[in-house]
From Swiss-Prot:
One MF term in the entry's GO annotations: SNAP receptor activity
Cytoplasmic side: 1-213
SUPFAM superfamilies: SNARE fusion complex (SSF58038)
GO CC annotation, single: endomembrane system
Protein name: Probable syntaxin-8B
Keyword DNA-binding part of the UniProt annotation: no
A Gene Ontology BP annotation from the UniProt entry: vesicle fusion
Subcellular location: Membrane
Domain of life: Eukaryota
Amino acid sequence: MGDYWLNEHDNIVKLINSLTADIKEYSIQQRNNPGIVQKNTPAKLRNGLVHITNEILRLQDSLTYGNNRNIQEKELLRRKNKVESLISMKNQLNSTLDAAINNTSQKNELMGNNNGVGIGYSNRQFGKPKETEATKQFDNQQLFTNQQHIMREQDESLDLLSQSIMRQKNMAHAMSNELDQHNEMLDDVEIGTDAVSMRLRNANRRMETIKQNAGSTCMIVCIVILIILIVVLIATDSGCKIYNDPKHCP
């Protein structure tokens, strides 16, 4: 199984590349055929950038507050550099998105809106704004009610966004806790491995001592056997033959 942190880093890089392609496509459509561009496209692109920012912060927090005891200092520094690179990419992406949106706004001001305002004419209106067809039949109370309805919809959208962020936060905490548990298990395994290694080293030292003692014992036994053999030879006919002396004959 691959490293979880590196997998998350690769996923963020994919998100950045995907959003970069979306911004480029948005700019091309605004330049060539602005009529097919949806009005909520800038908001979607901005939300994508916010999501990437949150993912980078979560990845950065895992290095700052996570359990990194099993990561070497060199690898930890390399991962911090990767996060800095992601932040630079995100900032560049933010500048690109701002430029695309600002160019769109400036073009709309220069060229006019899609309701037939020609080149060189501003869509600025003086005096009372033109009433829309949707609110034309409303009285003051109905306008107030409609405005409250719009505000409630905006509040509901914000609540949904807040709930989504909270779910992501809870998921991040759950993954962090799970990683801590895995790290604790790995620490236990490492401690057990160290204990077994120490026992093996002690056993090897004992074996070496036994080998040395066995060698000394064998030498002593051999000397004793030789002495006994010499005594036996002297006390038997073999001694008489060896010395060729009647004194050594039984």
